[in-house]
Amino acid sequence: MTISPPEREKKVRVVVDNDPVPTSFERWAKPGHFDRTLARGPQTTTWIWNLHALAHDFDTHTDSSLEDVSRKIFSAHFGHLAVIFVWLSGMYFHGAKFSNYSAWLADPTRVKPSAQVVWPIVGQGILNGDVGGGFHGIQITSGLFQLWRASGITNEFQLYVTAIGGLVMAGLMLFAGWFHYHKRAPKLEWFQNVESMMNHHLAGLLGLGSLGWAGHQIHVSLPINKLLDAGVAAKDIPLPHEFILNPTLMSELYPKVEWGVMKGVIPFFTLNWGAYSDFLTFKGGLNPVTGGLWLSDTAHHHLAIAVLFIIAGHMYRTNWGIGHSMKEILEAHKGPFTGEGHKGLYETLTTSWHAQLAINLAMMGSLSIIVAHHMYSMPPYPYLATDYPTQLSLFTHHMWIGGFLIVGGAAHGAIYMVRDYDPVVNQNNLLDRVIRHRDAIISHLNWVCIFLGFHSFGLYIHNDTMRAFGRPQDMFSDTAIQLQPVFAQWVQNLHTLAPGGTAPNALEPVSYAFGGGVVAVGGKVAMMPIALGTADFLVHHIHAFTIHVTVLILLKGVLFARSSRLIPDKANLGFRFPCDGPGRGGTCQVSGWDHVFLGLFWMYNSLSIVIFHFSWKMQSDVWGTVAPDGTVTHITGGNFAQSALTINGWLRDFLWAQAAQVIGSYGSALSAYGLLFLGAHFVWAFSLMFLFSGRGYWQELIESIVWAHNKLKVAPSIQPRALSIIQGRAVGVAHYLLGGIATTWAFFLARIIAVG
């Protein structure tokens, strides 16, 4: 940290342009108004594709100064938030008007959540299954009921009011998006003032946001959940505002602290924090009534997070000559072997939003995958852990979202390299040095992929062969040649024992996934130790293989986006181009865009195996029923350890055996999943028509169809064109992923709703 002389400091100001862009509905009504070429209108059918491809590519618009692009992004953020608020409002509205929330709240272990009732127009009423409590509807797996209970929502009217609040917020966001682009648009220096931005985001969004949530948890969620856990009916519990306005209600539940506007904070400032130990706890483990984390633990967590981030929001130097400067930190950050280190990165990240976005997407994607793993190992909401369909859905959802964001990070990294990279700024710094030894990086990564691929598949094929020959004693398994994941087992053991030393007052381990007892709620397993064996060791190395291949493709795309041995001037061809002519041993599918295209398939590959592993492992070794004497019966009876050792086992005992429910769903409330399963297979197959396509064949076909139209004098004025190679690939990968994801969705849900 440095303290600078006042004359060196440039004062931070909020500077805006007034009325920079007129609000013109007439202009917006003209398709392609943002681009001179597109605004002329269509000559050929390619125009409509370009319209969609470029509408959000602000760099290509007619006015594309850095300032204007920054303003458009800023404004679009508000539009995005408006869409999110409308979407959330719809969720809450369904909860208010079409759900069995109150019935679920009264009996969450037997009643299933439902917030959608289908109108029986031509017999669709069959989809409204009996979810318990006398309610018929579609079982939902979003986890919203559990979240609402954790928030302290006790009736449908509260959901209705919140839904209206969501629409009000959406309106405010739309207004803000318009206002900050058309009326008062910030100047470029405001967008580039990173210290103020960090301070506001850290202290404001994360710090005060967490503090607000902690306050809500303490004053509303905790008392309401304490009463619900004790068996008090929701209708007999005081309303949220009563707990806030009436201190005696809180004193009855949490007598240690004196409740009142001023009295309540005295223990905080006199360091008598023990007074808060009724509701700011450090118990560890799960609440045995609900199978979720102790809400008093999560309130404590959010309060601690708030304190950390509010302090963090005072770290950076703005108008007071004290604190860190981002540029100074980056330029001082160099090691003995890294040349100029991080020099130049400040300029890069303040002038290239693609570079900034690439980092943010990679980080948020990784975070989403971390969230996926915490949702089952440390289920945050009441009765979430025993709602197996919701657990499976939340894991799958957060894995896929994470995968898409990480691929997006590579996409924008490559766009940065092509459009924004400045060789003058990046001289012998980390970025330059990585690019200069990219051949070593990529060839090593390639070797790792080959090694992992052959060895991990080799182990499976060995097992398939030995099982076919009737030689189980020669297989890699827990009962023959063991390949135990000893490091993973050591880490599990370490995490089970460590809190005894690091958090001696905690009552239970951090997560029962690592070790400890079985937590059962309503006769179902909420969480229990997840034992790892040879089958997990094998599939783990398949995960390692597929993830490394995904990284290889994406990283190669970024590092070779500007140039390669075959195409030294690749940067001039742009982010996406189909080929660079014949000869030279092949120049097709080498653009930055093509690497993203190929990376998406491997991302899908990787995550399919991850969610299959999770689904089968949990059904086999975790999820199931608990008898009064404590005996656990798992859904598939622990068959993972022996069946998942061979490729045939995965095909027969997972895919085929567990598809029985979706294939046999016709005539039941799950029949929609049967139709989706079929339809999504069709969408997936349709994608192959675009991926294995010959563009010339289609263009020829189109020409002969146009000839026929000309003969009949009904030819269109806009010339039809076959899809370009890039367009075909884009349509192909979109349908491939949509078909694959919807197929998996139908397969998973039909199965787990039937047996879970």
Curated annotation (Swiss-Prot):
<feature type="transmembrane region" description="Helical; Name=XI">
    <location>
        <begin position="730"/>
        <end position="750"/>
    </location>
</feature>
<feature type="binding site">
    <location>
        <position position="579"/>
    </location>
    <ligand>
        <name>[4Fe-4S] cluster</name>
    </ligand>
</feature>
<feature type="transmembrane region" description="Helical; Name=VI">
    <location>
        <begin position="392"/>
        <end position="418"/>
    </location>
</feature>
<keyword id="KW-0602">Photosynthesis</keyword>
<keyword id="KW-0603">Photosystem I</keyword>
<comment type="function">
    <text>PsaA and PsaB bind P700, the primary electron donor of photosystem I (PSI), as well as the electron acceptors A0, A1 and FX. PSI is a plastocyanin/cytochrome c6-ferredoxin oxidoreductase, converting photonic excitation into a charge separation, which transfers an electron from the donor P700 chlorophyll pair to the spectroscopically characterized acceptors A0, A1, FX, FA and FB in turn. Oxidized P700 is reduced on the lumenal side of the thylakoid membrane by plastocyanin or cytochrome c6.</text>
</comment>
<dbReference type="InterPro" id="IPR006243">
    <property type="entry name" value="PSI_PsaA"/>
</dbReference>
<keyword id="KW-0157">Chromophore</keyword>
<dbReference type="GO" id="GO:0016168">
    <property type="term" value="F:chlorophyll binding"/>
</dbReference>
<dbReference type="GO" id="GO:0016491">
    <property type="term" value="F:oxidoreductase activity"/>
</dbReference>
<feature type="transmembrane region" description="Helical; Name=III">
    <location>
        <begin position="198"/>
        <end position="222"/>
    </location>
</feature>
<keyword id="KW-0479">Metal-binding</keyword>
<feature type="transmembrane region" description="Helical; Name=I">
    <location>
        <begin position="73"/>
        <end position="96"/>
    </location>
</feature>
<dbReference type="InterPro" id="IPR020586">
    <property type="entry name" value="PSI_PsaA/B_CS"/>
</dbReference>
<feature type="transmembrane region" description="Helical; Name=VII">
    <location>
        <begin position="440"/>
        <end position="462"/>
    </location>
</feature>
<keyword id="KW-0472">Membrane</keyword>
<protein>
    <recommendedName>
        <fullName>Photosystem I P700 chlorophyll a apoprotein A1</fullName>
        <ecNumber>1.97.1.12</ecNumber>
    </recommendedName>
</protein>
<dbReference type="GO" id="GO:0051539">
    <property type="term" value="F:4 iron, 4 sulfur cluster binding"/>
</dbReference>
<feature type="transmembrane region" description="Helical; Name=VIII">
    <location>
        <begin position="537"/>
        <end position="555"/>
    </location>
</feature>
<feature type="transmembrane region" description="Helical; Name=IV">
    <location>
        <begin position="298"/>
        <end position="316"/>
    </location>
</feature>
<comment type="similarity">
    <text>Belongs to the PsaA/PsaB family.</text>
</comment>
<feature type="binding site" description="axial binding residue">
    <location>
        <position position="689"/>
    </location>
    <ligand>
        <name>chlorophyll a</name>
    </ligand>
</feature>
<keyword id="KW-1133">Transmembrane helix</keyword>
<dbReference type="GO" id="GO:0009055">
    <property type="term" value="F:electron transfer activity"/>
</dbReference>
<feature type="binding site">
    <location>
        <position position="698"/>
    </location>
    <ligand>
        <name>phylloquinone</name>
    </ligand>
</feature>
<feature type="binding site" description="axial binding residue">
    <location>
        <position position="681"/>
    </location>
    <ligand>
        <name>chlorophyll a'</name>
    </ligand>
</feature>
<keyword id="KW-0148">Chlorophyll</keyword>
<feature type="transmembrane region" description="Helical; Name=X">
    <location>
        <begin position="670"/>
        <end position="692"/>
    </location>
</feature>
<dbReference type="InterPro" id="IPR001280">
    <property type="entry name" value="PSI_PsaA/B"/>
</dbReference>
<feature type="binding site">
    <location>
        <position position="697"/>
    </location>
    <ligand>
        <name>chlorophyll a</name>
    </ligand>
</feature>
<feature type="transmembrane region" description="Helical; Name=IX">
    <location>
        <begin position="595"/>
        <end position="616"/>
    </location>
</feature>
<dbReference type="GO" id="GO:0015979">
    <property type="term" value="P:photosynthesis"/>
</dbReference>
<feature type="transmembrane region" description="Helical; Name=II">
    <location>
        <begin position="159"/>
        <end position="182"/>
    </location>
</feature>
<comment type="subunit">
    <text>The PsaA/B heterodimer binds the P700 chlorophyll special pair and subsequent electron acceptors. PSI consists of a core antenna complex that captures photons, and an electron transfer chain that converts photonic excitation into a charge separation. The cyanobacterial PSI reaction center is composed of one copy each of PsaA,B,C,D,E,F,I,J,K,L,M and X, and forms trimeric complexes.</text>
</comment>
<keyword id="KW-0812">Transmembrane</keyword>
<keyword id="KW-0460">Magnesium</keyword>
<dbReference type="Pfam" id="PF00223">
    <property type="entry name" value="PsaA_PsaB"/>
</dbReference>
<dbReference type="GO" id="GO:0009522">
    <property type="term" value="C:photosystem I"/>
</dbReference>
<keyword id="KW-0813">Transport</keyword>
<dbReference type="InterPro" id="IPR036408">
    <property type="entry name" value="PSI_PsaA/B_sf"/>
</dbReference>
<keyword id="KW-0249">Electron transport</keyword>
<keyword id="KW-0560">Oxidoreductase</keyword>
